[in-house]
């Protein structure tokens, strides 16, 4: 009785410490059936603990097995089927049978090699794309933890600055570089100030449209626009747009300042390339206009003088 309890304690401790890649897919009862007939060749005695150590060495702690198990989301079931196809025939064959450790070593190593070859051909994960978002398709299966590792990025993306003149059209796209599920819901929100605090925003639209458009922007529409993407009520990513609408009067004022600055800017001093000076076009036009005006005034005065002389000759005193 004492020997049985001792074996049971050893078996329980081994099961607890061996929760890694092999235990992700193979049931504990099947592992027990596999290892109960394990015989140490050197001592010709049954040793269950040595069998589990062999499983750890060949499967659970082998880097090649762990790397082969890093598949994309949705392929963990395929991974399980591959491993069970290699292990379960050995379990059924060794169940309630005594086999030497050399036989265990040979059969389990062959099963591990076959698993590595088959699992390595499965689609790999596309990878995590920084800097933000819960990237469902980017997660990778971890044989050590028996679950998918997330990309561990924050949900909030860095804000994007947008500046537009009053009465002009502006658009904001709720787009991300990673794949999204097909059942996403997009919520657009607005806050008057520059913020990322959820309580400062008011909902604007809810639907599936990734585009938010303002046909004719007004200064009072300046502020922060938030786009949140959800799937099954779980937030996947939040994008922020900091919109600044420049009033028309301010635009004209800035334009006038630029014109004045250009007019007052001194002309660059360059050594003359010719011996005579060429006037600027604007000054030349002014001079020509003044000259033509003087000519017309002179002609007018001459005509008036000629008319007066002719009148005096025709009507002598």
From Swiss-Prot:
What does the record say about its membrane topology? Single-pass type I membrane protein
| Topology Cytoplasmic: residue spans | 303-317
User: Could you tell me which residue ranges the Ig-like domain spans?
Assistant: 123-237
Q: What happens when the gene is disrupted?
A: Leads to male infertility; mutant sperms have reduced dcst2 levels and fail to stably adhere to the egg plasma membrane.
Q: List the disulfide bonds.
A: 21-143, 24-146, 35-51, 128-151, 132-157, 174-227
- Which residues are exposed on the Extracellular face of the membrane? 19-281
Q: Which SUPFAM superfamilies match?
A: Immunoglobulin
Chief location of this protein within or outside the cell: membrane
Q: Which UniProt keywords apply?
A: Cytoplasmic vesicle, Disulfide bond, Fertilization, Glycoprotein, Immunoglobulin domain, Membrane, Signal, Transmembrane, Transmembrane helix
In the UniProt record, does the keyword Glycoprotein occur?
yes
Q: In which tissues is it expressed?
A: Expressed in testis.
Top-level taxon in the UniProt lineage: Eukaryota
Q: Which GO terms describe its cellular component?
A: acrosomal membrane
Signal peptide region: 1-18
Q: Does the keyword rRNA-binding apply?
A: no
What InterPro entries would the database entry show? Answer: Ig-like_dom, Ig-like_dom_sf, Ig-like_fold, Ig_sub, SPACA6
Q: Where in the cell is it found?
A: Cytoplasmic vesicle, Secretory vesicle, Acrosome membrane
Q: Which residues are glycosylated?
A: 29, 168
Q: Choose any GO biological process term that the UniProt entry carries and state it.
A: sperm-egg recognition
Which residue ranges run through the membrane?
A: 282-302
| Domain topic, free-text comment | The extracellular domain shows strong structural similarity with IZUMO1 but does not interact with the IZUMO1 receptor IZUMO1R/JUNO.
Q: What does this protein do?
A: Sperm protein required for fusion of sperm with the egg membrane during fertilization. May regulate the expression of sperm surface protein DCST2.
**Quaternary data:** Forms a complex with izumo1 and tmem81 on spermatocyte cell membrane. The complex binds to oocyte protein bncr.
Q: Which family does it belong to?
A: Belongs to the SPACA6 family.
What is the designated name of this protein?
Sperm acrosome membrane-associated protein 6
Which species is this record about? Answer: Danio rerio
